[in-house]
Amino acid sequence: MRSAQVYRWQIPMDAGVVLRDRRLKTRDGLYVCLREGEREGWGEISPLPGFSQETWEEAQSVLLAWVNNWLAGDCELPQMPSVAFGVSCALAELTDALPQAANYRAAPLCNGDPDDLILKLADMPGEKVAKVKVGLYEAVRDGMVVNLLLEAIPDLHLRLDANRAWTPLKGQQFAKYVNPDYRHRIAFLEEPCKTRDDSRAFARETGIAIAWDESLREPDFAFVAEEGVRAVVIKPTLTGSLDKVREQVKAAHALGLTAVISSSIESSLGLTQLARIAAWLTPDTIPGLDTLDLMQVQQVRRWPGSPLPLVDVDALERLL
């Protein structure tokens, strides 16, 4: 016997969260809980404003229609990426296809003062990996901050993300302020320039490795080995079903590329599932999941070690 619940939720964000020039005051999303006999599976559907093609309202409509079809015996996944991902996670939990083991070692995210990151990394056991958003300020400032971090922590490897913010000139201004002796410790820089060709040229001219992120979701993207390209960053909420995520990881690994499972600012429930996916599909790579601190609460499932208060499912708005 099948049953299902759908919940709608809204989480207040910290004041400083800006996405593509838009301040994100709340994170809005949906949960689906599927039950069959004694088994249960959860999934999160939370399109990311400015990045997802679909809106929260569109996702809700598609999810409710899919749940009604599932209750009637139809299991075909929806095409909408955020819904396909959330639904496939719920189905995978229902059938024990998503392993319980999780990789909760998130690469810490530097959102402001580099001194805060230096202190956080001092206590980090093992491999020291951190992420810095660049492209939000002047490229020269970004270069100086990155150089400072690499100089201060000799065993640090940085992942940088520019979200296609730079022109070729801005990219050169950034690189000018990063000591060439430190550049090999930039694990990769995600999508430095507005076009893929400009990003490839940036990698050639600076010796700084790049990674594809937004490119993976463009219709003309193909997985090929390219000089200067070291990694792909896979955001499942923006990608689609678990099967599609697994296909992309497999394609990247076949080319010798690093595949990084990364957050689209999901709630704690979604983040714990991403940690399980990372342990399953990319066991040797620290995932990019250090986004929970941008929120004011956790929901339904806790992220281990987080001091944020937990909102129980009974406090959420039930739609079905």
From Swiss-Prot:
User: What is the superkingdom listed in this entry's lineage?
Assistant: Bacteria
Q: Which reaction does it catalyse?
A: (1R,6R)-6-hydroxy-2-succinyl-cyclohexa-2,4-diene-1-carboxylate = 2-succinylbenzoate + H2O
The record's Gene3D superfamilies line, in alphabetical order, gives: Enolase-like C-terminal domain, Enolase-like, N-terminal domain
State the active site. 133 (proton donor), 235 (proton acceptor)
Q: Which cofactor does it need?
A: a divalent metal cation
Q: Does the keyword Magnesium apply?
A: yes
Keyword field: Lyase, Magnesium, Menaquinone biosynthesis, Metal-binding
SUPFAM superfamilies the UniProt entry points to: Enolase C-terminal domain-like, Enolase N-terminal domain-like
According to UniProt, this protein's pathway is: Quinol/quinone metabolism; 1,4-dihydroxy-2-naphthoate biosynthesis; 1,4-dihydroxy-2-naphthoate from chorismate: step 4/7; Quinol/quinone metabolism; menaquinone biosynthesis
The biological process GO terms on file are: menaquinone biosynthetic process
Residues bound to Mg(2+) are 161, 190, 213
GO molecular function annotations of the record: magnesium ion binding; O-succinylbenzoate synthase activity
Family annotation (InterPro entries)? Enolase-like_C_sf, Enolase-like_N, Enolase_C-like, Mandelate_racemase_C, OSB_synthase_MenC1, OSBS_N
What enzyme category does the UniProt record give?
lyase
Which E.C. number(s) belong to this protein? Answer: 4.2.1.113
HAMAP family linked to this entry: MenC_1 (MF_00470)
Q: What is stated as this protein's family in its record?
A: Belongs to the mandelate racemase/muconate lactonizing enzyme family. MenC type 1 subfamily.
Q: What does this protein do?
A: Converts 2-succinyl-6-hydroxy-2,4-cyclohexadiene-1-carboxylate (SHCHC) to 2-succinylbenzoate (OSB).
Name of the protein in question: o-succinylbenzoate synthase
Q: Please report the organism this UniProt entry assigns to the protein.
A: Escherichia coli O7:K1 (strain IAI39 / ExPEC)
Traced from the root, the source organism's taxonomic lineage reads: Bacteria, Pseudomonadati, Pseudomonadota, Gammaproteobacteria, Enterobacterales
Q: Which gene encodes it?
A: menC
